[in-house]
Amino acid sequence: MTDNAYPKLAGGAPDLPALELEVLDYWSRDDTFRASIARRDGAPEYVFYDGPPFANGLPHYGHLLTGYVKDIVPRYRTMRGYKVERRFGWDTHGLPAELEVERQLGITDKSQIEAMGIAAFNDACRASVLRYTDEWQAYVTRQARWVDFDNDYKTLDLAYMESVIWAFKQLWDKGLAYEGYRVLPYCWRDETPLSNHELRMDDDVYQSRQDPAVTVGFKVVGGQPDNGLDGAYLLVWTTTPWTLPSNLAVAVSPDITYVQVQAGDRRFVLAEARLAAYARELGEEPVVLGTYRGAELLGTRYLPPFAYFMDWPNAFQVLAGDFVTTDDGTGIVHMAPAYGEDDMVVAEAVGIAPVTPVDSKGRFDVTVADYQGQHVFDANAQIVRDLKTQSGPAAVNGPVLIRHETYEHPYPHCWRCRNPLIYRSVSSWFVRVTDFRDRMVELNQQITWYPEHVKDGQFGKWLQGARDWSISRNRYWGTPIPVWKSDDPAYPRIDVYGSLDELERDFGVRPANLHRPYIDELTRPNPDDPTGRSTMRRIPDVLDVWFDSGSMPYAQVHYPFENLDWFQGHYPGDFIVEYIGQTRGWFYTLHVLATALFDRPAFKTCVAHGIVLGFDGQKMSKSLRNYPDVTEVFDRDGSDAMRWFLMASPILRGGNLIVTEQGIRDGVRQVLLPLWNTYSFLALYAPKVGTWRVDSVHVLDRYILAKLAVLRDDLSESMEVYDIPGACEHLRQFTEALTNWYVRRSRSRFWAEDADAIDTLHTVLEVTTRLAAPLLPLITEIIWRGLTRERSVHLTDWPAPDLLPSDADLVAAMDQVRDVCSAASSLRKAKKLRVRLPLPKLIVAVENPQLLRPFVDLIGDELNVKQVELTDAIDTYGRFELTVNARVAGPRLGKDVQAAIKAVKAGDGVINPDGTLLAGPAVLTPDEYNSRLVAADPESTAALPDGAGLVVLDGTVTAELEAEGWAKDRIRELQELRKSTGLDVSDRIRVVMSVPAEREDWARTHRDLIAGEILATDFEFADLADGVAIGDGVRVSIEKT
């Protein structure tokens, strides 16, 4: 490349992946990322929180998608003058890490961990969580994402963990952390509870499962005086037969009507509304012996199905439950308080303590001797058999099994090990979320959400129903809960620590590692024990890993022990992004802790994108291989192609996205190649490097510069509101106008080395690459550096509003010209009339034909028509067809919507000057109806976009037009021949043409037209024995003159 010439580019299609690798190598050598940060020193800061991923697995499409957004927004904000730090983080604790190590070591049980030693196990976890950091860095770098790996944070670091225990201590001091006994989702494989929000994070947490469902009669003993229930059976239905040995009560709704019916020699009680559901067992028209309101049944005593806990205080009575319905079952609900959240609440209110015969591994213990050692799911079959035969433990109290069926239903599974969960009462530590739930709802209103509906929808509704958060886990690899208790209940004491200083003060040693087992070794005498025999010991639990990540804003900088001023200036964050499931995960825990600790939101703006699916529409699966390999896509199409495919899709507006190879390649075809080809076109035809100019008077130059000004404004508007798909669409539309209109219509000017055209295109590409830089950072870097020879497009500012001349009228007119040409071209194609065949006439009917008057010749030339007629008589060639949008209008209009539809169909709808529609008794707003322009003659007429008008194409072909079309076909063939023989576009040539006799008149008539277009200074007709065949029997020879 000389100082005054563009780089010489290789011919043919560009190798985009290879070019991208060159850029990445340049960035690495140049340290461009750090330069982009440094040049904003002293500028206002834009605070981006990068949610930490787990590093014990390789990145997938979901990570790539989020990562692209995490790159685009900081790049854009940096160009807008902000300093944007991009510190990477690693989520390192929790069961994902533990399970990976268990797989590596062949561990299947917690007892094996205890046997090998917690220290050894946690050392293995530490090594595992950082196993893939190099691979992660390679992926992140390859996707052209700029992040600071050198200054990363890890949740396992001592400083990070100290901030986390500080947060717990703050909650304790505020009365917002407590220990309680609750029914929680419980993983028997991992032997630990889960929090409720973990069950709602991913769609596949609830999986279809078949369970035995039984309807069992519990025999009433005593009943109420004179109600006739003594000896009848209360019918209950359950899909968890394994909980029947723990039954302590049944619940009814006080307001539901119940009946006692005779069926054979037995009497059964159930909700009247459920009789039909049990017609097979009870008869089509059973004899009703009595009718009762649920309230009348309260206190009724019965015999439980199994007699293991017959002496349990206050048990085995009918209680009131507001959760009881008649949607399924019998209207009477079996309650085992240790295994049902509602059951526990109702039972506690009347003094029924739970029984817990199931151990931490999900197996029955000795208190249920007949099933001892069996896993609860395995015991279901034997329990059903015993009920069916009234044998074994079911023989004592005589329960009656009247139905046994298989019930398929969505059932929660552990999101980590994928085993089905149970609900089990456990002791756990909680954050008292219900105390500040209303405040969380209020603070959510200060957050800007994209999509907007997430605020009051998925996230807002979740906040409204938020329950206390179970934050303790009975595991090993995690931040310890900093609670020490006396080991003697006679001298109770609880100490909570929130810093290393506090631990050192009381234990005389400053921990160098807060992980187990080292933290567990810190003990001291109980200060409240005068005997001096009891000891303060740490509880064995660790914190929920979501507590770790939710602490990220302050823990990453070791707040409040360091960086107090920094934190105050960087909290809340300006922006975060993750997938929609994090409304139950990271978004949620950030919000909980921010509200509890600081009474502020943790973030100002959040993008919650949809889910990336495999090409079969299912969740991506390695075993199914239902998605393109990421590395192969990078190697074949490049990162910018992947970025464009993901960012231009509806997924950032909350929809899901199916990944296909064709979809990725479409981005190359629609945007990347057109941008590259435009740059290549300029480099090929410009005799020297263009200069910045915006003063050309040529209408096409003025148009593309004004169109670029519109792009600048549109992109700015979209990026300011994080509408990245909208920004991509604006760029795609501009690229279409640039390549398929401006460059194509200006080719002859470039061939003539027109300085206005060259300078204008140079200027347009220079600005376009800056505007596109956040969206397509690699290809824009190549083009920018080739255009300007400057260091990097990513070290430039966002184009200013007054940088380019604007001309709204010209843009509107030329855009309509393009629409006219597009519609007419579609008609020509439908009629199968080739492009080079001239046609006699095009009629353009628009509201303001004067707008198009200056462009009549351009339209005629573009469409190859002899005459263009402009008119405002739209109704001559078509009509507007009105339809009512019933889905929108219906809720407001009610029954009047049908009258409106009828009026519109009858042609009685009238559009008012204000845009409303009068239709029968109703007045519809513009969004409640649709207006579509319909052509009177669809074969020759087409509507313009948005009902702007119509075009009518006369497809009559005369002999004269056919002859001219024949000549233009030959011109195209001769141009291709020039190109294939290596002639320069400006070379003059000599042509000898041999034409069949039947075409000789056509050839001679249009000799000058042909010669002029192909730059032939000498053109003659003669018979050729050899020469090159170019079509329709024509042979030619050409040579440079």
From Swiss-Prot:
Subcellular location, principal: cytoplasm
List UniProt keywords, sorted A-Z: Aminoacyl-tRNA synthetase, Antibiotic resistance, ATP-binding, Cytoplasm, Ligase, Metal-binding, Nucleotide-binding, Protein biosynthesis, Zinc
The reactions it catalyses are:
tRNA(Ile) + L-isoleucine + ATP = L-isoleucyl-tRNA(Ile) + AMP + diphosphate
Where is the protein found, in the record's own terms?
A: Cytoplasm
Q: Which cofactor does it need?
A: Zn(2+)
| InterPro entries found in the cross-reference section | aa-tRNA-synth_I_CS (IPR001412), aa-tRNA-synth_Ia (IPR002300), Anticodon_Ile_ABEc (IPR033709), Ile-tRNA-ligase (IPR002301), Ile-tRNA-ligase_type2 (IPR023586), M/V/L/I-tRNA-synth_anticd-bd (IPR013155), Rossmann-like_a/b/a_fold (IPR014729), tRNAsynth_Ia_anticodon-bd (IPR009080)
**PROSITE patterns from the UniProt entry:** AA_TRNA_LIGASE_I
For the biological process aspect of GO, one term held by this record is: response to antibiotic
Q: What is known of its domains?
A: IleRS has two distinct active sites: one for aminoacylation and one for editing. The misactivated valine is translocated from the active site to the editing site, which sterically excludes the correctly activated isoleucine. The single editing site contains two valyl binding pockets, one specific for each substrate (Val-AMP or Val-tRNA(Ile)).
Q: What is this protein called?
A: Isoleucine--tRNA ligase
Task: Give the lineage.
Answer: Bacteria, Bacillati, Actinomycetota, Actinomycetes, Mycobacteriales
- The primary gene name is ileS
